[in-house]
Structure formats: C-alpha cells, structure tokens
C-alpha cells in the first residue's frame, strides 16, 4: 500500500509541475503556485470609449483611472489605497469582472525588460541646461504645425560644422575600408526626413535638449509611467538611453551642437515607458500611441538577453502591433524598428525574442568599426539588416546627444543600431510618403549592402541570389540606395498566408531521448485553399517541444530552393526543462523564393546526457507572401499545374461556346481590333477590358455599374470572389471573401468571425469587437485577426490554463477542459470512462473486468453528461490532489535524486553518433510509421 501511495504522489506531482510550467512565454506566471509578482495596475476594456463611464466604474470600486485610454477602449485603473491586502484587491477585481459594462478585466504584472546597450566610461561634454519635467499639452497649434508644408529640399553643405560630426565615422566613410552607410548620397539629394515623425519607445527623451528641441514632436510623445504628456525622464543618472537614441535619429545639423542626426529634419518624440514597471498594457499603450500621426517607432529594448529566456509581446501588445500595420499612417501601416539583442556573450539568440521574431518589426543587427560582428551580437534568421555600432573600448562607438543637454561618443550596442536604421528609413519615407510597412521591408533588404561584411563567416546565397546571414541579415543598410529605390517603388500586392500543419504519426507526441535528430518534411503547392502564395516574404514555424534542457535543442529549416535557416541554435545557458509551446520562429531569409516544393524541418539535440528525455509535439509552417511579383521587374514564377489546367479548360470553354444566358450573339459583332489581352473573340473598344465580346479567363461584375457591366480579368480583384468563371461582388463589409456574405479578410483592423463549426454565430462576418463567447486571436494568422471560439485557441490535446495559455491535456484525454483525467471531454485511444466518470485504460480484450480498467466494449454514456457536472467533479479531484501533493513534497528532492533513468515506455528514436556519423535506430522496428514523417539523414550530407 505504501508503494502505491508513493507512486500516486509522484504522478500527481508530475502533473502539477507540468501544469505550472507549460507556458508560451517565460514571463507568464502561474498564480496558483505563487509564482507571480504583485500586480502593478488593473486594465479594463469597455465596449466603446467612454471616459466618464470608466471613471464612474473605477470610483464605484474604490479605484481611479490614470492617463488616456489605449487601444481605443482600454483603461488603466489603480487601487485607491495601496495598503490593502491582496485578497481585498482580488475581490475588487472580481466585482469589476461582473460589471455589465466591463467586457474584460485583468490585473497586469511586471515583465522584465532591459535596454540594449552596455556600459562604457563616458567622455561626455555637458552643457549647462536645466533638466526639468513639466506637462506639455497636445493642442491644435501643435497639430497644425506638423501639417504645415515644409520648405523645398535644400542640399546641405558638407561637412557639417557640428563639433562631433568628424567623429561620426559611420556617416562619412570612416569605417575600415572607407565604408559607411551611404547616408551622404541621400543628403546630397536633399532628403533629411522632412514631414516624418519618429517616436522612441524607451525611458523618455529630454525634449528641451538644445540639439533636439527644434525637432521635438509632442504628438509623438507621452509618459505612460506617470500618465501625463511630458516624456522627460527622471534625472537619476540612468535614464539617458531614450535621449541618446533620439539624437541618433534627429539631432539638428549645422547648429554647432554635438553631431548630426541621420534624419536631421525629422520630427522626433519619445514615450517614457521603461522608467517604471513594464507590463503588457504599458507596452500596448506605447505601441498604439497616435498611430495615424507617428510614422516610425524605434525600440531598443526587449526581454533579458541572458541566454535562457523565451519571451515576447503579450496579447495587448500584439493587438497594438496588428492595429498599427492595419490602420496606422492612414492604412499604410506603422513601421516598427527593433534592436535584435545584446546577448551574444551568453550565446543567446534573437529567435527567443518575440519582438524580433514578429512579422511586423524590422529587426536590426550591429557591425563594428572594422566590419566584424561585435561580441554582443545575437544570431537569428529574423534579422533583416545591420547598421554600424560599437565594439569594445578600443574602437569608436556612436556619437549622439546626452542628458542633461550634453553629448557623448560612447553610445553602444544594438540599442544604437535600431535608431540609426529608423533615421535612414525616415529619409526613404520623405522620398516616398506612400510606402507601406511591407514596402519598407522589401526596400531595406533589397538595397542592403553585404560587401563590407563579406569577410565574416556564415554568408549564404538564397534561392533568388541574395546574400544573407544569421548575423547581419542582408547586410548594411544603404541610405542612398534605399532612397533611390523608394522614389520609383510601386506598392506591393496584398499579402496572403498559407498554413501547413504537420500531421505527426504515432506515437504522438513523439518521445525523444539523449542526442537525437528528427527530420520532418512538408510538401507545399502554393496553398491548399484560398489565394496562393507564389512569392515568399516571411516564413514562420510554430513548434512545440519539451526537453530536459531546452538549450540543447537546435532547429533548422530548409526551403525547396535549398536555403538553410537556423531557427534556433543551441543556447548553453538555457537549462529550462519545459521547452516551448507553439513558439513563432521567424525567417526572412527565403524572401522572394517560390515556396512550392518540399520543406524540411530538422530538430536535433546537442546534449551530452544520454538520459535526457522529452517529447516532440507539433509544428506548423506559415508562409507569407503574394500571388504576384512584388515589382514589375521581378522574376515571374509559373502558375501551379492544377491552376494552369483549370484556366486552360476555362479558355477552351469560352472559345468554343457562348453561355445560354448571354444577351447577345458575339459573332454578329465586328471587333474593333487591338483588343485587351484578356479579351477573347474580339471587342467593341480597343485596349479595354470592359469591352470584350468574351473573356479569356474570368468575367468580373463592375461594382460602379450597379452589377450590370463586366470586365475581363485573369484573377478576381479584392472585394470579389470566384464563382465558376465569374468574379462576383463581396459584401461591402468584406475586403476579400469566399462567398458574398462570408468574408475571408476584413478592411482595416476589423476582426473576422471564424467559427464555421458553430453555425449560430455569424461566421465570416467582419466586426469591430468579438461577440460574447468568442475571443480575439491576433497570433494564429498575422494577416487577419479573428474572433474564435475560446477552445480553438489551442486545438485538440490542449486546454486554456489559468493564465490564458495552452497546456497539454492528460495523456488519457484526447480533448479536455482542464488538467487531469477528470477533465477529459473525450478519452484517448485505449482509454474509456463509461462507468466511473474519468478516463482510465481499457481492459485487454478477453480479460476479466476489474476496477483497475474500463470495459471499452460498451458505448460511453458520459459523452452526453453535462460538462458542468464534470467540471465540478474535476474541481473536487484537484483539491484532493493538492493535499496529497503537499504531503509528498518533503520527499521530492530525495526521490528525484534517485530517479535517474527515463520511464518513457517507447523505444528511443534514432540517435546521431558525432564520432563516426552513424545513425543508431535503437530498438525501433516500426519502419512503416517512421516513413510517414521522418527521413533520417547524416547532417554532414545535408
């Protein structure tokens, strides 16, 4: 009996540990085990903006509102008495949650965020200047000031007289080999960032600095930490980071102060948000500030660069990013520039940083004065380009302004790289203000210069002939080339997404032991449904892996063109034993390639511990791109065979006969000649797609003709859907659709209701906010945010835990609502719950039935039981579990030290022998299952 209790206790403890640590981001805590920090504020969301209602709700709960709302309808609430007990505060929040006007409420906890510079002894030149904080209101005068037309472009006289300009080696050929970022070529065409607004998200900026004051933009500035409009940082000796970044972008030129900013005529603002506790809501409020006014947001911070953290933006920050690219700048999209990270000395990777792996950001790396990688550089395939920065104290760093009112030549790290990139991007926006956020990503990577950095190892040529590196992206940003290409750039076609989910053969999840290598292949043919992606932009891999030491894992992706991207290198400092859950790894290295063909994901371990165990669960390939070339001069890929045959048969049909419903007989008409390419059989007007006798490909109804006219097209335009050989109009609330009233994508930042399995909802409708019972999903599809049924956030085999993240169901459950066997909705294969109410193993066929197993030969009546009963029973079970766990915790260390080997019943998978290159298949004999999803190869051959 003692042995049985001990075994049960250990099983319970294992479940509790799994529940506690199965999380998406390392910063997400589990309050049930006391792992959370004290909440710093509470956020509520109302149905629409109503400041007076928000204040009344707060007052009724002995709280108060601070600052302006963010994301339109979200408000910061603070408890009136900070000495209240935690239990009292929680009770207030629970009452808030039940208020009929409150759609959502959450206590916000601090997240660890660090500035991406490092400390050198500053040789600063300080000027006497008062360092003050005063509130500056945003008024109509300020707004009108920015809207006034600027004077014509003036060609500056170089070199500038500013005293430290001579030390800005990265701007005038001062790097080894005479290299720089070719900014002077843009300046000499008169571009200096006019009419472009840049906001520095950081610890604030000194708005009255003599080298910034004339360019200061109050509409691009605020204080989220203290909830006022003045971004001036506290003068405590530490808060100089944001001011330094601002000076790199827009320090004045020709005023004999410090050096010059890259975009010295741009408007510069700052958000004070790092000078206090940082939460998801603080980040969201910063990222969503005045998105129609601000053009570029520059951020030189992120999760800890310690080599052991996986973390990224929370749900509110992700929504802010999404709204920015959808609605910002009048629908052209805000441009988010991010520093790639300073964890190189700890062998960190920016692939573990959810800000740099966001599709919406331009991740910027660094290079040194002598064109090498700096010691702090992090590698990842999401880095798009590089600027110069610092190395060590023996080499020159970056010149900029400093607080209070001085200058420095010691600005460092990738913190210095992101603002330089933002300034150069501002030059391109002045040259072409119509550029979208995706246009800018195209331009930056197409014009980047890899030649100054070519002597660094790791460069490779991708499938379209561009050189790319995990260290430097596509190379140094080239200001002159960027501006020149921007001037003639045409807006890229709409971005689409294709999703391919890998189906893992049994055993699922797949046990992994020791040093292993798994190779999974996916065959891609454009898109299984919807608009095809033939010209790649971003590539994402969402993967779930559990392993004893997360830092021993390595993930590599191979495209059909042979481009190899190391999505995750080994990180020796990362001893996390929980792996990662659906982490969005990003690569921009396949940009421009044709995605069709076989993709291969290699998952391997570099461990030296043969007893290291884990499980591989799932992976999904997300391909972002367009159906047409981005620019007219780009290579044109052939259409898929299936599509070509379909189009060909349609042409033959139109050529051979006229539809019965056609109101005219085409042979009776005389063709005008020189018909449009889409015409078939003649036309009544030359070169007009609306005057054809018949169409080669598709007939599209004209919206402005009330549906009575048509034009011939090769494919349906946006706001139309394909029905046979006709393009019919979508409903006016759709951007694209699959049927007239079933939207596929929505205009602006509207949310798409995607609940086809729940017909009582308006599936396919575009809405401003999700109806009750549905939740907004900004993560699964970055092209179109959706309203989904809450369970769909995770999928089969997972449930939503207490902190809103996906956790694994118990192994006995195929689907579940909570942890443990008591919460199964449907039992796994080989389990049943027909007689006892929870899933347990089926009795062997022909064996004597006993209380230890389930008679699975009988139908399961519990499938019809109300889920509320099951949930209540499950709650009782977990109360008992907690008591047993508390009793068994004392023996935890002793038992753990005695338990050395794995208790996984599956035979070990293939292991790679690094000494002789052999692949050891161990005792695995089920070759048929292996062939379904794995091809074991010698990595030296690959």
Swiss-Prot record:
One GO cellular component, as annotated: membrane
Binding residues for Ca(2+) 1: 124, 211, 252, 255, 257, 259
Annotated transmembrane regions: 872-892
Signal peptide stretch: 1-22
Binding positions (Ca(2+) 3): 305, 348, 378
Cofactor stoichiometry and binding remark: Binds 3 calcium ions per subunit.
FU repeats: 674-723, 725-777, 804-850
Catalytic residue positions: 202 (charge relay system), 241 (charge relay system), 415 (charge relay system)
Region (Disordered) location: 130-160, 211-242, 922-942
Record annotation: effect of changing residue 415 to E: In h384; probably catalytically inactive. Lethal at late embryonic stage
Annotated Peptidase S8 domain residues: 168-483
Cystines in this chain: 258-407, 350-380, 498-527
Binding site for Ca(2+) 2: 223, 228, 230
Positions annotated as glycosylated: 195, 519, 868
Membrane topology summary: Single-pass type I membrane protein
Needed cofactors: Ca(2+)
Protein family per UniProt: Belongs to the peptidase S8 family. Furin subfamily.
Name this protein carries in UniProt: Endoprotease bli-4
Organism: Caenorhabditis elegans
The encoding gene: bli-4
